[in-house]
């Protein structure tokens, strides 16, 4: 449950348009006004995934801290890791405003931001000032007007190699025309070959191998999932993030806002994204790391992502409604789940409801 101060802050922020409120929240984190809410360390929640030591399985998804302004402040809220971006080589303004919409009855958000960000240079300078111990991933994308989108992803690898703990290639935003075409098998093979070749070159030069993840959409056909899984396995990719926002509008209460174009996130995405997660786990087998994202709003929904096949989970939109205390509450709740079920590690529940979720028709 949120506390009275969080509820008051939320009411104040909801008087502002969503994009202004987002900017205010970034400034609040920068200033230190938002107190640390981290849960006590719990070895049962620790995991080594893709060679990285995660203190707990909960991360902040890309999209909130686009320009790497507050990664360490987010970690102090209780997240085990955070992901900045999506960043593109050149700064870009994104799509016209308004471009973020709250669906309050649904505890959802629709956005059509379009990779608005300050560009590689600005984000790099900020990350260079961060502790090297902070577990910060860098989500990379392509400029809207790029003549060579694959080259933009390669530039992201090279630019941020010294400061990224992991990379995410975002090919699944619905708000950059043609971007999701990179999920098609031939295009995906070319992208992964180029990105991983750049990573391997940087690893050879530095002696440090940075894992690369791929973030996919939930709006995939079975054939599309087959193709992505085949390329992930063929390229020995370090992991998958499932999923980005959806274009679907099924079952929403707020039909007025539901008509807005863009990607839907928040509570209504939970079932769809979790089913796709489980289907990808079935295709990839037990060893490829998967980060589950979409509709995580509580310790129980975070745990259910793990039961469906995730190693780690991320959230963003639900914090709009639950406040900055949410990550700490989720991490404490996962510790309580370990107590209740007498778990030596949170990993013990992974895949325990894989068949159920893989069979869901959503």
From Swiss-Prot:
Which compartments is it annotated to reside in? Answer: Cell membrane
Q: Which UniProt keywords apply?
A: Cell membrane, Flavoprotein, FMN, Membrane, Oxidoreductase, Pyrimidine biosynthesis
What reaction is this protein's catalytic activity? Answer: (S)-dihydroorotate + a quinone = orotate + a quinol
Checking SUPFAM superfamilies in the record gives:
FMN-linked oxidoreductases
Which Gene Ontology terms cover its molecular function?
dihydroorotate dehydrogenase (quinone) activity
Q: Which cofactor does it need?
A: FMN
How many and how are cofactors bound here?
Answer: Binds 1 FMN per subunit.
Q: What EC number(s) would the UniProt record show? A: 1.3.5.2
Q: In which pathway does it act?
A: Pyrimidine metabolism; UMP biosynthesis via de novo pathway; orotate from (S)-dihydroorotate (quinone route): step 1/1
Q: Which InterPro entries match?
A: Aldolase_TIM, DHO_dehydrogenase, Dihydroorotate_DH_2, Dihydroorotate_DH_cat, Dihydroorotate_DH_CS
What is its EC class? oxidoreductase
Binding residue positions for substrate: 66, 111-115, 170, 175, 244-245
GO terms (BP aspect): 'de novo' pyrimidine nucleobase biosynthetic process; 'de novo' UMP biosynthetic process
Which GO CC annotations does the UniProt entry carry?
cytoplasm; plasma membrane
In the bilayer, the protein is annotated as: Peripheral membrane protein
Q: What is its main location?
A: membrane
Q: Which PROSITE patterns match?
A: DHODEHASE_1, DHODEHASE_2
Which residues are the active-site ones? 173
Where on this chain does FMN bind?
62-66, 86, 139, 170, 215, 243, 266, 295, 316-317
* Keyword Transferase attributed: no
Any Pfam family the entry gives: DHO_dh
Family label = Belongs to the dihydroorotate dehydrogenase family. Type 2 subfamily.
> Assembly and interactions?
Monomer.
> Main role?
Catalyzes the conversion of dihydroorotate to orotate with quinone as electron acceptor.
> HAMAP family under this entry?
DHO_dh_type2
Output this protein's name.
Answer: Dihydroorotate dehydrogenase (quinone)
